[in-house]
Amino acid sequence: MSNLINLNNIVYQVDKKYILKDVNCHINKNGILSILGPNGAGKTTLLKIMAGLIKPTSGSIKFNYKLPIGFVFQKPVLLNRSVEYNLIHALKYSIRPQIDQSKELVNHILNENKLSYLKDKPAKKISGGEQQLVSILRACIIKPEVLFFDEPTSNLDSEFKNTIEELILSASKKTKVIIVSQDQMMARKIADELLFLDRGTIRSEY
């Protein structure tokens, strides 16, 4: 079975400073990969390269996944419209044949996750934890082949962390999940594979 992503000799520099150096890894198509490491290790940069959001300075990448992908940022990026609108808007950019049923699909996913009370609320006025939940649902609703998470539980209380952990585990049954997290307990708990990055270099994989 071919790998989902192949990274060979990846280098990423900013103003001649190495953010990533000689990164080689081969990501399989199933389960959850957690990328761990200290602040400044290059984790988010590596995640964005894996997602095709930025290009490396040198090295080669082979992507064996199809668009769309889902990407959940550390700080939720939502439109200043209702939660329902944000989810429907995501479907407009999906290549999946589900647009005609978009409202029904949005209602279903909100009800399924006990978040129907958020449907008509402005996304910018709900709590930070609720915004992150909506961001995750927005990423999942397009049924991507890969879901990328950049510090999804940062600065959230334990209740929201637990809910997000459950969402990630649920999503991983249908799609590959790659997550960057400083929360080592959570990242290790849910991961099928771990990759440890330090000073821009992979130190271990297991």
Predicted segments, located by residue:
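Helix-to-loop junction immediately C-terminal to a conserved catalytic motif
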Residues: 51
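Conserved ABC ATPase signature
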Residues: 122-126, 130
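The feature captures the beta-strand-to-loop junction immediately N-terminal to the Walker
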Residues: 36-38
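Conserved catalytic motifs of ABC-family nucleotide-binding domains
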Residues: 76-85, 89, 96
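Conserved H-loop
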Residues: 175-181
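Catalytic Walker B motif of ABC-type/P-loop ATPase nucleotide-binding domains
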Residues: 147-150
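Conserved ABC ATPase "signature" region
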Residues: 100-118
